[in-house]
């Protein structure tokens, strides 16, 4: 029986990272729930066993029920009936299976019906689901919107809404509008407080809303009359039970067919404020988007894993010229690079997730008591690390999953262009990952300051001092040379003092930094488990070294005056 977790031991390796000790310690707070909830862990080992068992259950559901339904869901898609959405029959079955297994509200405290899981094992579950059906993964993983409500909502909102998500109700985040895509400060959905109704009334249109007919919505709307920028925006909670939001249409998309992407019309929809006015975009949506970007990184890794599996299986079975095509260098070169990108991207994803876990757990503790000076320092450090790695994890993994599905189709040859193999679905589903929740270009905008302020370089230099196996020492030397090139290229861009030159070089610098960090992470993994990661570390070293050299050449040879050649009239 297929199991997306146990079939891929790389996940259990990431789960057992040494930082999990600190994460569990912070999350469970001396295991204080053990006397109140029979499913609360007694100690660290018990907590880790619980994560492992839930991942096993999720992997089994993903590898059987969700995988078996995926093709039918892709063909059927959701239905627009009146002003509402009806999921494809397979999607409804998938949701039912996940709810019955208790896989909702995973990161929420037990007092609300959650599992109190860290972000890391929850993110792994999101990867497992996406590997079978990325569209369904969107619906299920939008439960993590509840993190934002938990962080910024009040206790009354916590007690009313969080248990519903833990019980299996669905969520959406309603941000985008026809004239406000990447530029969210242009959002114009109007929020007006009604003294008569005793609530806020929302009016306007939202577009490209994933799972738009969800039970609970987090909505970005303009609450301040006469404003046109981000400071006039607030966040609201809309409950579908209140009425006032209709689905105008479901978009006809290239991929993720099971996920209903909706245009919504708000007509005096009753809503309540989440947090404080004017902080909707500049604080709450930024937190919401960071969580979503980690989720898309997990989705991308899941799709990459599925693409690699399909390519490997086809290459092993398909014979040409008297032997399986996997034996031809042109094919095993592609497969090896797919696996290296998969392993490197996954390492980056879970390094980021662990950093998020530590600072978020400390944030939560700070709501109960004052942090010690040591805890405040730890919180600040891991928050900065998480902020720096989030755009890399989302940007690089979404690009890698597009590349890996492309190569998997290439391995299939003409058969890959037919609709008979699942790889065509993975290819279509992958395309959106580098677009939604911030395009790759916007991830570069978020990441470039960590290049120019030296944060990524400092992380690389710290990695260079780590103990590694003898087999990996030559790779550390190569990674150091790559970091030297990053340092030189960064200095050149900063010295130029030209904004447009800085912007056109930004992606090159960010990818250089990502290549260096991911190589170090693979070196670390290969030191701990050579059997799982040594091949990928060597392959990725060859690939990333060439990539860094390419980007370095571009940046060092380009001049600010050359930008005139790039401007398209």
Per-region residue spans from a language model:
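Alpha-helix capping/hinge segments and adjacent helical runs
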Residues: 2-5, 10, 17-19, 256, ...
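C-terminal helix-coil-helix/basic helical segment that borders enzyme active sites and/or dimer interfaces
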Residues: 343-394, 490-504, 523-531
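A structural-propensity feature for long, helix-poor, extended segments
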Residues: 154-160, 439, 445-487
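C-terminal amphipathic alpha-helical interaction region
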Residues: 454, 466-569
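A glycine-rich, basic-preceded beta-loop-alpha segment at the flavin cofactor/substrate interface
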Residues: 35, 39, 241-244, 248, ...
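Internal helix-loop-helix
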Residues: 59-60, 90-163, 167, 210-212, ...
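A short core secondary-structure module
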Residues: 199, 203-245
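Extended, charge-enriched "interface" segments that sit outside catalytic cores
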Residues: 1-81
């Amino acid at each position: 029986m297929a199991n997306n977790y146990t079939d891929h031991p790389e996940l259990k390796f990431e789960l057992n990272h040494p930082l999990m000790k600190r994460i569990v310690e912070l999350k469970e707070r001396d295991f204080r729930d053990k006397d109140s909830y029979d499913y609360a862990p007694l100690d660290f080992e018990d907590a880790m066993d619980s994560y492992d068992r839930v991942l096993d259950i999720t992997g089994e559901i993903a590898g059987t029920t969700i995988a078996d339904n995926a093709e039918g869901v892709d063909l059927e898609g959701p239905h627009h009936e009146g002003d509402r959405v009806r999921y494809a029959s397979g999607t409804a079955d998938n949701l039912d299976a996940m709810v019955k297994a208790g896989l909702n509200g995973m990161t929420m405290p037990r007092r609300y019906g959650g599992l109190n899981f860290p972000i890391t094992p929850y993110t792994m579950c999101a990867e497992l689901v996406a590997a079978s059906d990325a569209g369904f993964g969107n619906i299920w993983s939008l439960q993590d919107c509840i993190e934002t409500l938990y962080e910024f909502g009040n206790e009354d909102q916590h007690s009313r809404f969080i248990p519903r998500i833990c019980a299996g109700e669905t969520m959406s985040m309603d941000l985008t509008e026809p004239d406000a895509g990447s530029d969210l400060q242009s959002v114009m959905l109007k929020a007006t407080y009604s003294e008569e109704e005793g609530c806020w009334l929302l009016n306007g249109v939202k577009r490209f809303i994933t799972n738009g007919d969800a039970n609970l919505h987090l909505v970005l709307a303009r609450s301040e009359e006469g404003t046109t920028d981000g400071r006039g925006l607030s966040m609201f909670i809309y409950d579908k039970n209140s009425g006032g939001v209709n689905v105008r249409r479901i978009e006809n998309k290239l991929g993720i067919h099971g996920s209903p992407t909706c245009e919504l019309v708000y007509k005096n929809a009753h809503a309540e404020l989440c947090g404080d006015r004017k902080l909707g975009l500049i604080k709450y949506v930024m937190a919401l988007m960071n969580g979503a970007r980690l989720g898309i990184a997990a989705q991308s890794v899941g799709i990459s894993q599925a693409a690699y599996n399909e390519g490997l299986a086809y290459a092993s079975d398909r014979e040409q010229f008297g032997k399986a095509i996997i034996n031809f260098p042109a094919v095993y070169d592609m497969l090896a690079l797919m696996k290296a990108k998969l392993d490197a991207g996954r390492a980056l994803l879970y390094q980021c997730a662990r950093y998020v876990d530590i600072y978020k757990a400390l944030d939560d503790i700070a709501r109960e008591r004052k942090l010690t000076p040591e805890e405040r320092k730890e919180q600040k450090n891991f928050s900065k690390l998480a902020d720096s790695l989030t755009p890399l994890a989302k940007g690089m993994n979404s690009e890698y999953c597009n590349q890996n599905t492309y190569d998997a189709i290439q391995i299939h040859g003409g058969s890959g262009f037919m609709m008979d193999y699942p790889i065509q679905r993975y290819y279509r589903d992958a395309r959106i990952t580098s677009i939604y929740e911030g395009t790759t270009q916007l991830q570069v905008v978020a990441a470039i300051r960590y290049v120019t302020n030296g944060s990524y370089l400092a992380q690389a230099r710290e990695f260079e001092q780590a103990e590694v196996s003898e087999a990996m020492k030559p790779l550390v030397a190569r990674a150091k040379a790559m970091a030297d090139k990053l340092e030189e290229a960064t200095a050149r861009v900063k010295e130029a003092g030209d904004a447009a030159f800085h912007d056109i070089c930004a992606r090159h610098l960010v990818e250089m930094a990502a290549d260096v960090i991911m190589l170090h992470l693979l070196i670390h993994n290969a030191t701990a488990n050579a059997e799982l990661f040594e091949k990928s570390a060597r392959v990725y070293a060859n690939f990333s070294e060439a990539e860094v050299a390419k980007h370095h050449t571009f940046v060092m040879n380009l001049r600010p005056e050359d930008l005139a050649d790039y401007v398209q009239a």
